[in-house]
Amino acid sequence: MKEYINITCEDNRALMARYPDGYFELAIVDPPYGIGVTRMTLGNGKRKINRGGLEWDNSTPCQGYWNELFRVSKNQIIWGANYMTNFLPPSMGWIYWDKGTGLNDFSDGELAYTSFNRALRSYKVSWVGANANNGTPRIHPTEKPVALYKWLLKNYAKQGDKILDTHFGSGSIAIAVDSMNKVEGMNLTLTGCELDPDYYADAMKRIKAKTAQRSLFQ
């Protein structure tokens, strides 16, 4: 693993407890939405990936998680925050990810809360069906494209920022950080964790394969 990427398999509150107030310049997180995505399908009749029968998306994170997240990070980008607004302060700087789904049964996009005092921004990158990831099957139910994370880093992170991800999932953010460091010279560091050991193992395998490639422009 790259020296600027540090990912552990543990509970996110245990991870955050080790860091002082305001240690991370930016947290980019994708916590459970509390809507049972593990029971949904990918549009082809197949169930979304759910390891070991764990219904991890039955509820949103507790108040203790949010207390720690806002303690250790100066700014936050939170996917699915429209399901957890009761935990969040008001903000004008939301993000809309346009998935380019067209006329089908999938959601047109997803929302992310940000703590930045900016106008709402939208970004479009197609993400339709089980094989949206450049023809590669997804390894996590809420996996997001690397291109989306690269856009977030380019527009919301600053050079040398310390980034936190408390729900690592498929590891797309790590591939994006590696690309932005190599191509844009951003000198970012990423600290993250994933609770599920199977998702963690799959993400580590994916990151090692992707970051070893000479070109990361996908």
Question: What is each stretch, according to the model?
Answer:
Residues 169:
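Conserved glycine-rich SAM-binding loop
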Residues 1-154, 158-164, 173-218:
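Class I S-adenosyl-L-methionine-dependent methyltransferase catalytic core
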